[in-house]
UniProtKB/Swiss-Prot annotation:
Name under which the protein is recorded: Proline-rich receptor-like protein kinase PERK7
Residues found modified as Phosphothreonine: 325, 495, 500
Enzyme class: transferase
The reaction(s) this protein catalyses: L-seryl-[protein] + ATP = O-phospho-L-seryl-[protein] + ADP + H(+); L-threonyl-[protein] + ATP = O-phospho-L-threonyl-[protein] + ADP + H(+)
Origin: domain of life: Eukaryota
Ranges per topology, Cytoplasmic: 194-699
Binding-site positions, ATP: 342-350, 364
PROSITE patterns: PROTEIN_KINASE_ATP, PROTEIN_KINASE_DOM, PROTEIN_KINASE_ST
Family, per entry: Belongs to the protein kinase superfamily. Ser/Thr protein kinase family.
Annotated gene: PERK7
Subcellular location: Cell membrane
Keyword Transmembrane helix part of the UniProt annotation: yes
Topological domain spans for side Extracellular: 1-172
Source organism of the structure: Arabidopsis thaliana
Residues that bear Phosphoserine: 465, 494
Amino acid sequence: MAEGQSPENSPPAPPPPSPPSPPSSNDQQTTSPPPSDNQETTSPPPPSSPDIAPPPQQQQESPPPPLPENSSDGSSSSSPPPPSDSSSQSQSPPPPSTSPPQQSDNNGNKGNNNENNKGNDGSSGDGGNKNMSHTPPPPSKTSDHSSHSQPRSLAPPTSNSGSNSSSNDGLNIGAVIGLVAAAGILFIVMILLCVCCFRKKKKKSKLDQMPYYGSNAYPAGKTGGDQYYNQNAATQQQQHYNQNDHIVNLPPPPGSMGTNWVSSPPPPPPGNWQPMPSPPAPVSGGANVIQSGEMSSNFSSGPYAPSLPPPHPSVALGFNNSTFTYEELASATQGFSKDRLLGQGGFGYVHKGILPNGKEIAVKSLKAGSGQGEREFQAEVEIISRVHHRHLVSLVGYCSNAGGQRLLVYEFLPNDTLEFHLHGKSGTVMDWPTRLKIALGSAKGLAYLHEDCHPKIIHRDIKASNILLDHNFEAKVADFGLAKLSQDNNTHVSTRVMGTFGYLAPEYASSGKLTEKSDVFSFGVMLLELITGRGPVDLSGDMEDSLVDWARPLCMRVAQDGEYGELVDPFLEHQYEPYEMARMVACAAAAVRHSGRRRPKMSQIVRTLEGDASLDDLDDGVKPKQSSSGGEGSSDYEMGTYGAEMRKFRKVTLESRDYGASSEYGATSEYGLDPSSSSSEEMHIGGSTSKTTTTNRGI
């Protein structure tokens, strides 16, 4: 223990024991301390590493105390290193005095071991200083180097092991952090995907309820009118079609044949249910086109957003379930009262109705007893189930029962028809931007029917009174009662001629060959109405001139000199963009070409109206020649030909009606309470004036 305490007072103690040897040993040891210091300086890294690592090394060096015996037995160079190391360390107290912190850092046990080794080395060193006076230095150096090389060799592994462990820990921590971060990112991505899917489903449900409009004013739900509109949505989904105000000849609710409505036993509705003779009775079973003109888009239903109790439990999602009872529709229209009458025609009447949930609808009642009406009812429902477009009027539901009652329920459009604003008594002049918007919207709806539906759909009755307007004056094509399906591989469909005078394509009126170009011609006539403000026929001249015959040379003149004065509606007062007017005039002139092959597609007209195509694209390689009168000169067309053909066709149809060849011929009152005469022939029957759209509807 005295020796254990001597390290603190080690500087004075060493000189007395062996004055001669210390110098030599010290000299030799003095040379050794620097390396030892250097070795120690290299050894600090182990201490810097975990403090536990160095002690085991010292403890591993402490067990070799038997090594001194080996050193005493022989002065082998291999054995001395441990004792010499211990001796060098035992004789290095003075240097340790300068570096006690290092040894204190290494542990107190090391100093104690050095002191114990010092005593052993002292006894052995005293006996062998003379003999080993010169030899020890080399061994001591070698021993020092070897001894220190061992710790050096040991130290790096410990430091490496520490660094490896620390690096492993770092890698483990980094891996854990990476996994956590990846899991967090994956979780966030999954949440975002769920949110997106939810929004898409929500939007889809809204679109399903009101497929044509992005804004559905009615909350989706199964309460109140929501079920009703879900029916509509499902109806439109299954129908994939915006149901237009389609007039389908099907036995109307109460009425048998004839114009008078027979009071229907079923309806106990609120208003007095009376026969419908009140509306002006159409002439002998006339093929009057009932245009549910006010079929409103979903936009028009905005004010009725609050949901109310459903109209009837039978009203549920899906077209098959979007059926109404006759009592429900009679109640919605106040017993089909005259106050709710929107229009009448050869196939029945159109009334405005309000469902219990506040939704406004247009109810078309079809007359009973007509096989043609039944077929057209089925055709309209079939076609409506195939289409889905925001510029086509949508069908809400229908009523069909064993009593022969056939009713179609459409969305209600508040702004009536294009005909009403152009030729009716609206009291306002439609400005040019609105006219252009209506032309473009109806062109898109018609292009969808021709080019996006398979098989394609030919409307057969495009006219101003079948273009319905929502509260934003967005156009909706209506009335698919005459529409025909045409396979893509069919060049044309041979069918009975149906339509309205002034809009019929010449090849269709003369031969009954129906193609999508027949609709293009009718659309061209409607464009001329928007441009000129005139009707399709000139009633003042007893149909001597049609709008097509009158406007064609003016359109050609506009193309030459750019003068619109005679052609453009004077009520516009030059408030229009010349380049927009030029595009519409070019589209109209190309659409009413006498030859169907030379007319453009509806998609070409859409692009031209939007300004995405040049006017030359409408010609599609066709360069019309100029006649001396300024009209289009071609081998199959001469001035006045269209009007002459229409007069001939009218005569044939009127004669067939007079002889009773078809019960479907007759007078028509265009949609609306104040129908105009633009697309109808003025006829005086029994002292009363009614308008006839001589639609040839064969049995």
